[in-house]
């Protein structure tokens, strides 16, 4: 009898939905200079957050490369401008730029890359932006990242 009751409790608990935080996101880029997501939400209970970037287009990275760069909203334009001068060899991100919270490498069609960053780098209430720093892309390929409760 006790075994049946224990089994019933275990099976009931196993059927409950898992409420763990989602500490990763996948974003796609394409040959039309677009991301498929305009917003990402990071649960503040996550210690780290991973972004998986996939280029679903066909063009090479020298012609239509994309990356994913995270900064404060106020720093976006300056980081993008400085990134253009850094060049493809630096993934269009100025070396040592402390305004950059995280970034992937520049990828071409059919490629993917991931980046993981510490959520402790994010401040509640701060406005964050992500964008592609490939020259000419940042004005179109952008979105917001929010820290949630």
Swiss-Prot record:
Sorted UniProt keywords: Copper, Disulfide bond, Electron transport, Metal-binding, Periplasm, Signal, Transport
Gene designation per UniProt: azu
UniProt cross-references to PANTHER family, sorted A to Z: AURACYANIN-B, OUTER MEMBRANE PROTEIN H.8
Location(s), subcellular: Periplasm
CC annotations in GO: periplasmic space
Plastocyanin-like domain segment(s): 21-149
Residues that coordinate or bind Cu cation: 66, 132, 137, 141
Reported function: Transfers electrons from cytochrome c551 to cytochrome oxidase.
Protein name: Azurin
Signal peptide, first to last residue: 1-20
Disulphide bond pairs: 23-46
Chief site of localization: periplasm
InterPro entries: Azurin, BlueCu_1, BlueCu_1_BS, Cu-binding_ET, Cupredoxin
SUPFAM superfamilies assigned: Cupredoxins
